[in-house]
């Protein structure tokens, strides 16, 4: 494919246009009086959201150079979301100002490299000060963080705080759609562990990059699976049951993984594979725990069990499984409490008999995972659009509250950033030339979130920032009053602010130091009736039955590379 090349001011101008297009759409959502954004969908009703990263991921600009700028800023939101779970709009607002001021100064002849160094020094200084001001939280403060992070929804805040109280802050909390109009909290059996899907092709929700199955079956084994022949009998059985299948094994790779991916993407099977947690003997123990939780059988080499003899009765069952890139959460059915209690008692007896501190630690971890349970927040709403919006708010509140417990809190509403910005004056004076300019850029960016929160509340942003500096108090956009925001319950998680700043300066400094952009030349539209797009799976193979491989036919199961 041919490329288009742009350089110097022309390239940076196109990037900034893309940054502004995305940031202007996202920043209207910040604060308690932030507005909603309507996203058109190819199929079904449009989504109405006020979640920054959801909006950012949906934006695709026609101009390829501007689109590159938009996608770079989307990375700011996505990185902050992945690491902190919240603060995506704050990160976007910060990055927009940093990019604008940085490019304005480089166009006037400043050195982009020196500006970047100054910006990085300023952010490092701010992060140190931020952590010094951090206050640890518990009790009512957890409720306040959850309420603020959900956009001021007290019902959501109370539910998130209650869930954390019941299963602990480190416990497993999942969010799912309710069959009723009410939003409810339920505590059930379940487990989570740090292993994700074997291939991103197993993802069922591309926007959130997760694989989620309702009422799946589980094949649990300590074997490594490389040949599809090992799986054919169980796949045939599962295909007839029409249930999703999750394969939990030492590893699934090679021909077996490729075939599962092909058939999942062709809609023949709802399937995913996950690498088993832990290592060695502890892996077998962890798999046995999961087998008890799901009323399944561990297909183990130690018992001379083989995969070709697996029946439907050997497969575990769960109410729901959610698999991300890095973790798996199993929500068990309601009929496993007796078995789980018996398993926990067995592990406790083992704990009493060991003298090793390391073994005790690992056994206690297993007990915590099995006995801790899972808090399920069931989200209800009158319409599907409101349901999706409410679900996003709850997920934001959960993530932000965890972040607040982890690194503490500071006053919210952008007021802390403004006060920290005032401490950059001494750093700016200690630096020369363009590095000092970089520090000044960060200082200006730090007032942007408070300014935008005020604008969304119908106030003059510059006046509000000036009053915050004069009074030494924060601006409560919900009431229009200047007050002590921590006492008012308007608080931000230090981790969220820290990551928003660090991610924003990371991408902004890259944009400022860009000299050349190379983009794909847009292809002309194909004539009507022409050939359609190719198979998105490329050369992953035909739909030939497995009978041609000398294996039992699977009624349309595809093999990679077969024509």
Swiss-Prot record:
SUPFAM superfamilies: GroEL apical domain-like (SSF52029), GroEL equatorial domain-like (SSF48592), GroEL-intermediate domain like (SSF54849). Residues 520-545 are annotated as: Disordered. Its main location: cytoplasm. ATP binds at residues 29-32, 86-90, 413, 476-478, 492. Its EC number is 5.6.1.7. GO terms for cellular component: cytoplasm. The keyword Isomerase applies. One of its GO terms (biological process) is protein refolding. PROSITE patterns: CHAPERONINS_CPN60 (PS00296). Forms a cylinder of 14 subunits composed of two heptameric rings stacked back-to-back. Interacts with the co-chaperonin GroES. Belongs to the chaperonin (HSP60) family. NCBIfam families: GroEL, PRK00013.1, PRK12849.1, PRK12850.1, PRK12851.1. This is Chaperonin GroEL 1. The gene is groEL1.
